[in-house]
Amino acid sequence: MLFLVISQTTSFMITVRQFTFTIFKFQFMATSNVSSRVNELLEAVKKEFEDICQKTKTVEAQKDDFEYKAMISAQINEMALMKQTVMDLEMQQSKVKDRYEEEITSLKAQLEARRKEIASGVVPQSSKTKHGRNSVSFGKYGNAGPFNSDNSSKPLILNNGSSGGTPKNLRSPAIDSDGTVLAPIQTSNVDLGSQYYSSPHVRPAVGATMAGSAMRTFPSNLPLGHPPPPSDSANSSVTPIAAPLVVNGKVSGNPPYPAEIIPTSNVPNREEKDWTVTSNVPNKEPPISVQLLHTLEHTSVICYVRFSADGKFLATGCNRAAMVFNVETGKLITLLQEESSKREGDLYVRSVAFSPDGKYLATGVEDQQIRIWDIAQKRVYRLLTGHEQEIYSLDFSKDGKTLVSGSGDRTVCLWDVEAGEQKLILHTDDGVTTVMFSPDGQFIAAGSLDKVIRIWTSSGTLVEQLHGHEESVYSVAFSPDGKYLVSGSLDNTIKLWELQCVSNVAPSMYKEGGICKQTFTGHKDFILSVTVSPDGKWIISGSKDRTIQFWSPDSPHSQLTLQGHNNSVISVAVSPNGHCFATGSGDLRARIWSYEDL
């Protein structure tokens, strides 16, 4: 019995052990299967992630390629549009060119017909010049305006001698592009002079010289002006200015009259074919008789006009050339053309100056070089180099041995003419627009873009600075006795200065900023040029408002207005003989005028 119990117990224990082993085996197998499945799932996820990354890279590459192709396509379309636009413009330009060529041919035919009529003794009615004085309403010019008198005299719009528009993109200061310009007359049967020269059919006689008239000097009892405080800096540097002189703005229509004049029906004007003289003194005749002597046609803008010391010749500066005319006849004597410069495009002669003996003509050009020409030989006698910007102004000393130049590089240079070398360099704070020797050659005046006028001795000592203008100073001129200085500015005013450096006053007693004796107002736009008559009686100014005005040193108001150009009056010069003056303009014309006191 006991054995049976033991046997059953043993059998039960064996059964339990087998059952336990079976359970452990099953658990082990289950754990192994789960681990394997997890690994498989992880591998699948990893593979899927890698596939997605690869597809993303492929899509991004395709996107970049698509955007690049789209950009190229847009640029191709834009280029095609630009090409079509250029072709359209070329077609329009060709049509305009053909039309202008037809007009030029027609005008040449009309001109030739008129010449034949004149040669045969038949003068067309429209070519007769009006004479006498006409009393017309102030500010009125008849039916056609001051610059258009008949259909045959309508000017042709040209661009530096070629068809297609008015002169644009010129470096010369204060040149409008809105005014109509006259075409130079060029035919196969004219000489060199007639390409640039034209005179009225009937020329008034040259006025008598001023030698016999009462000499009048600048008064010393003029009311003292009140210039504003001096500019910030008195010292200067040599740093060149970044840009050449450029005058902005436009003048539309005919220039207005001075503000102080009230239009009345009984104020006399003298009206000619294309120029008018207006008295600015109410109810009085013009105090000066002005007559047009010669019209000198050019193929480009005239930047400068200058008389020789004997008054027999007039020099003009224009694009790539300086011209010398006979004042009495108006004929072109010499054409000094710049061909050696390597610079392409426009190359304007900004300033000209005769030597006192009339043998040489100095020219200041945009290529930063000064050429002293032997006029008779038509060759460059001296080439002066050293400026780093364009040259805007030149003047010879009284003895002709020294030349002074002003440049945009902020320097005034004195040159030994015989040696062709720099003698002295004077520095300013900004570009120098105008320079001039005093009549005795002891002082040099210079106007600048920094609104200041500086006076040096001929040895280079700065003795005086004149402050008062509110904008750049573009022109200066000494009085005949050298005691006064006239300045013209872009602030539309002219100022008369009493020079302390020529007086017996000690430098320590100088009034700071200078002594302004008079401020002249009346011009409606920039003052581009001023000059003083040899007897000191008249100040003559040229302006961007297209007028020339006469001023008496005694009065701040203009005495007379001359309208003789249909673009900016860039330069004015008076003859040393005192009986005539010259003007140069953006309308491609220089004119010589006579004047005489009434």
UniProtKB/Swiss-Prot annotation:
CDD domains documented for this protein: WD40
Keyword set, alphabetical order: Repeat, Repressor, Transcription, Transcription regulation, WD repeat
Any one Pfam family match given in the protein's UniProt record, by short name: WD40
InterPro entries registered for this protein in UniProt: G-protein_beta_WD-40_rep, Gprotein_B, Tscrpt_rep_Tup1_N, WD40/YVTN_repeat-like_dom_sf, WD40_repeat_CS, WD40_repeat_dom_sf, WD40_rpt
Start-end of each WD repeat: 285-325, 332-371, 374-413, 415-454, 456-495, 510-549, 552-585
Annotated region described as Disordered, given as residue ranges: 118-177
Any single Gene Ontology cellular-component annotation: Cyc8(Ssn6)-Tup1 general repressor complex
GO terms classed as biological process: negative regulation of transcription by RNA polymerase II
GO molecular function: histone binding; transcription corepressor activity
SMART domains: WD40 (SM00320)
UniProt function note: Transcriptional repressor.
Family listed: Belongs to the WD repeat TUP1 family.
Protein name (Swiss-Prot/TrEMBL): Transcriptional repressor tup12
